[in-house]
């Protein structure tokens, strides 16, 4: 068993060279290889469940491991990346490890090209895992994550059309890529719930009943017109929450 007891304890998000911020000019920020390890417990994992991890950003390159299994790499530095942990995760203790490399001169492995924005004259180089990390547990019929770079999935997309500014109304559209990783055909409804800025329910609506064969992936949609909306204007912003769910 690997002994990481003497490693520095940190919380995420974390830039290993964060203490250099505003003390050094950006071209002097430390660039090197840094490792992260996280031990976590999965108390119970059912046969119909899947587990995903999402990193919102690892700079510049990240190599990812779960329980000693190499999951893959990501070289962009500013985009999110995720992995399906299901094949290698287990009930009880698990450990995920990440090797990060924020070399100023980093070149992409496949093309040997540099990233133009990874430049001493442009972008402060805060290395490590400087963005959030999320762990998801889903059913084996699930809405995918917007992590196309590694998982080739597009996730959930919400947008508005048919704006009536004076009437304070618009049509809200939601669509989700849904995948059936079970061994049977499944039927479900796509439900959308919209909450106002105070968390109060504004509207719930559903799309048509959907049938998804085993192994099939499909984009499902639903839309509805909402009234009494708060539109953004100069000096005024208003955030709604949209939740999407699959209902048997």
What do these predicted ranges mean?
Residues 31-152, 196-197, 239:
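Accessory beta-strand-rich segments of carbohydrate-active enzymes
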Residues 36-38, 79-83, 208, 216-224:
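Short strand-edge motifs at loop-to-beta-strand transitions and within beta-strands
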Residues 71-72, 76, 202-214:
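Solvent-exposed serine/threonine-rich low-complexity stretches and specific carbohydrate-binding patches
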Residues 66, 167-210, 220:
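Beta-strand-rich binding/interaction modules
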Residues 142-181:
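Surface beta-strand/loop "capping" patches
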């Amino acid at each position: 068993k690997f002994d990481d007891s003497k490693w520095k304890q940190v919380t995420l998000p974390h830039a290993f060279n964060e203490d250099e911020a505003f003390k050094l000019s950006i071209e002097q920020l430390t660039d090197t290889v840094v490792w992260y390890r996280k031990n976590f417990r999965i108390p119970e994992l059912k046969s119909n469940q899947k587990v995903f991890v999402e990193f919102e950003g690892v700079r510049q390159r990240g190599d990812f491991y779960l329980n000693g299994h190499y999951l893959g790499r990501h070289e962009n530095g500013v985009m999110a990346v995720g992995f399906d942990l299901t094949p290698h995760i287990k009930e009880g203790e698990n450990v995920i490890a990440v090797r990060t490399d924020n070399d100023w001169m980093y070149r992409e492995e496949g093309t040997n090209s540099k990233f133009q924005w990874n430049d001493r004259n442009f972008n402060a180089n805060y290395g490590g895992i400087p963005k959030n990390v999320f762990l998801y547990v889903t059913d084996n019929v699930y809405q995918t994550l917007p992590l196309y770079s590694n998982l080739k999935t597009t996730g959930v997309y919400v947008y508005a059309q048919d704006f009536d500014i004076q009437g304070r109304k618009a049509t809200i559209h939601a669509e989700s890529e849904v995948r059936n990783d079970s061994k049977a055909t499944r039927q479900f409804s796509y439900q959308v719930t919209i909450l106002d800025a105070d968390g109060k329910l504004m509207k719930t609506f559903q799309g048509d009943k959907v049938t998804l064969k085993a192994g099939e992936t499909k984009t499902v949609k639903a839309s509805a017109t909402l009234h009494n909306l708060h539109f953004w204007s100069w000096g005024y912003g208003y955030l709604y929450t949209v939740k999407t769910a699959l209902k048997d």
